[in-house]
C-alpha cells in the first residue's frame, strides 16, 4: 500500500515517520489524537483521484485535512478497524489560484489555497473575497467549503455556501465530478455541488472551487460600542439596519469575560475603552462609493442609541490602523481562550430577535449546573450565531475521570436551551466527530434518514471520513 502511494505522489508527497505525522493526526488544540497509515499530499486532482481509487480498492479510509483549524475534530483520523487505519489526505500542495475573472467575478482555485492568499489574489484582481475569520492565515478553501464556514461577514455576504459557484470533487471510487462552469443560470436538474458543501468530507474530496468575488468596499467605518445589554445590542442592530442595512459588514457582540481574556492574553492588542464594558459591539460598515458618509451614519445611529440609554460609550476608528486594531481584538478570541484554559465552545444559531433571551437562558443554566465555569459570549449578532463558551480551569479539568462524557453533558445542556428557541446546535463549526450523537438526537428523523441514504449512495464502503457527521451505526 505504501509503495503504491509513493508511486502516485512521490517521496515528497508521502509522510510515514510517526513524529512528522503528529501534527496531521492531532487537532490544533491538542485535545484529540488519531492514527493513520500515512499522510498523503497529492499535487494535482489526478493524483487525488489515483490515491482515492487505490484506497477504495484496498478498503482503506480516507481522512481529508485542510488547515486543521476546526473545532469539532472533523479532521482527526479515527478508523473503526485496527486493520485499516486509513490515510490522511492533505491538499497542502494543491495551492494554485487557477484563474481570476474580473468580468464574471469568479476565482477558480485549488482546494489547498489558504484563505489569506485568496484575499490577496482577489485584491490584485480589483475585487474582494468576503469570508473573514480568525484563522484565515491557515484555513484552506477545501476545508472551509466542507464545513460551510461562516465568519464575521455572513450578515452581508452569507456563509461559504453562498460564495461557491462551482466545485471539482473526487468521488469515493476515484472518479472526478467537474462542475466549474460557474454559470449564473443553470436549470439542468439537481445542483449536486450543494451536497458537498457542509458534508465535511464524507461524500468526496473537494479538489477545486469556483468562488464568487465581490466588489471592494474601500470606504469603511468601524466602531467599538459599549451597550448596556444584549437586548440593547439587538435594538442597535435593528436601528442600524433601518438607516444603513446594505452597508453592514459585521456586527459582533462580545461579553466582558471574553473581552477580559483577550486583554490578558492577546499580544499587541490596544483596547478602545479604559474599563471593560459589560457588553460591547464591534461594527463595520462598508461601501463601494467613496462619497458615502459612513462615519457620520454610524455616529448618528449610535448617538441616538446613547440618548435612549442603550449605549454607554463608543469609539469610532479614525484611521485604518485603528480599525485594524479593533479587528485584532475580535480575531484574538480563539487563541486567548486556548491560553486561558479548557473552553467548551457552543455554536448556536437562533433568530436574531431571540438572541438576548437565549443568552440569558443559557447563562442561567450554566450558572446553576456548572458554577466552576466562567460563561463567555461571542456573537455574530447580525445572523443570530451565538458562541457560548464555558471556560474551565485546567486544574478542574484534570480532576475529571473522563472528559468526553462531561463535555457532552455540558454541550447538551446548552443545546437543549437552543432547541427551546427553535435554534440549531451547529451554526458554522460543523458536526465533526464531536457532535454526531447530538445530530442524531436533535435532527428531524426523516431528514436524518435521508442524510444516511445520501451517504450510502455516494460512499457505499463508508471510506470517506468515516465517523464524521453521521454516527457510525447510522452511516
What kind of region is each of these model predictions?
Residues 1-475:
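Noncatalytic alpha-helical scaffold of FAD-dependent oxidoreductases
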Amino acid at each position: 500500500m505504501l509503495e503504491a502511494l509513493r508511486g502516485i505522489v512521490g517521496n515528497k508527497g508521502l509522510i510515514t515517520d510517526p513524529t512528522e505525522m503528529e501534527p496531521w493526526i492531532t487537532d490544533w488544540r491538542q485535545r484529540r489524537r488519531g492514527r493513520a497509515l500515512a499522510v498523503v499530499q497529492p499535487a494535482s486532482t489526478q493524483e487525488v483521484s489515483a490515491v482515492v481509487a487505490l484506497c477504495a480498492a484496498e478498503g482503506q479510509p480516507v481522512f481529508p485535512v485542510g488547515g486543521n483549524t476546526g473545532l469539532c475534530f472533523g479532521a482527526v483520523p479515527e478508523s473503526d478497524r485496527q486493520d485499516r487505519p486509513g490515510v490522511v489526505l492533505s491538499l497542502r500542495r494543491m495551492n494554485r489560484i487557477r484563474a481570476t475573472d474580473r468580468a464574471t467575478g469568479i476565482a477558480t482555485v485549488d482546494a489547498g489555497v489558504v484563505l489569506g492568499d485568496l484575499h490577496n489574489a482577489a485584491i490584485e484582481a480589483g475585487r474582494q473575497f468576503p469570508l473573514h475569520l480568525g484563522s484565515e492565515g491557515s484555513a484552506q478553501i477545501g476545508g472551509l467549503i466542507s464545513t460551510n464556514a461562516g465568519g464575521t461577514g455572513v450578515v452581508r455576504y452569507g456563509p461559504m455556501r453562498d460564495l461557491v459557484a462551482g466545485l471539482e470533487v473526487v468521488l469515493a471510487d476515484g472518479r472526478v465530478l467537474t462542475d466549474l462552469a460557474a454559470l449564473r443560470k443553470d436549470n439542468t436538474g439537481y445542483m449536486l455541488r450543494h451536497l458537498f458543501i457542509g458534508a465535511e468530507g464524507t461524500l468526496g474530496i473537494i479538489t477545486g472551487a469556483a468562488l464568487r468575488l465581490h466588489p471592494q468596499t474601500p470606504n469603511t467605518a468601524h466602531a467599538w460600542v459599549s451597550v448596556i445589554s444584549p437586548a440593547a445590542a439587538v435594538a442597535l442592530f435593528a436601528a442600524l439596519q433601518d438607516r444603513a442595512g446594505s452597508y453592514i459588514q459585521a456586527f459582533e457582540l462580545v461579553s466582558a469575560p471574553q473581552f477580559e481574556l483577550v486583554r490578558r492574553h492577546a499580544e499587541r492588542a490596544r483596547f478602545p475603552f479604559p474599563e471593560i464594558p459589560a457588553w460591547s459591539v464591534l461594527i463595520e460598515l462598508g461601501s463601494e462609493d467613496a462619497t458615502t458618509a459612513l462615519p457620520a451614519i454610524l455616529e448618528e445611529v449610535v448617538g441616538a442609541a446613547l440618548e435612549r440609554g442603550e449605549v454607554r460609550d463608543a469609539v469610532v476608528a479614525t484611521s485604518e490602523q485603528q480599525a485594524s486594531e479593533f479587528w485584532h481584538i475580535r480575531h484574538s478570541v480563539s487563541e486567548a481562550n486556548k491560553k486561558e484554559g479548557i473552553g467548551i465552545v457552543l455554536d448556536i444559531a437562533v433568530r436574531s430577535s431571540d438572541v438576548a433571551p437565549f443568552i440569558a437562558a443559557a447563562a442561567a443554566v450554566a450558572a446553576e449546573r456548572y458554577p466552576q465555569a466562567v460563561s463567555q459570549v461571542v456573537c455574530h449578532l447580525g445572523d443570530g450565531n451565538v458562541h457560548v463558551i464555558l471556560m474551565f480551569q485546567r486544574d478542574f479539568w484534570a480532576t475529571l475521570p473522563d472528559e468526553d462524557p462531561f463535555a457532552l453533558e455540558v454541550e447538551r445542556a446548552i443545546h437543549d436551551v437552543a432547541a427551546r428557541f427553535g435554534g440549531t446546535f451547529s451554526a458554522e463549526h460543523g458536526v465533526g466527530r464531536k457532535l454526531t450523537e447530538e445530530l442524531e438526537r436533535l435532527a428531524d428523523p426523516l431528514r436524518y434518514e435521508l442524510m444516511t441514504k445520501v451517504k450510502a449512495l455516494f460512499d457505499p464502503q463508508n471510506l470517506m471520513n468515516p465517523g464524521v457527521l453521521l454516527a457510525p451505526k447510522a452511516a
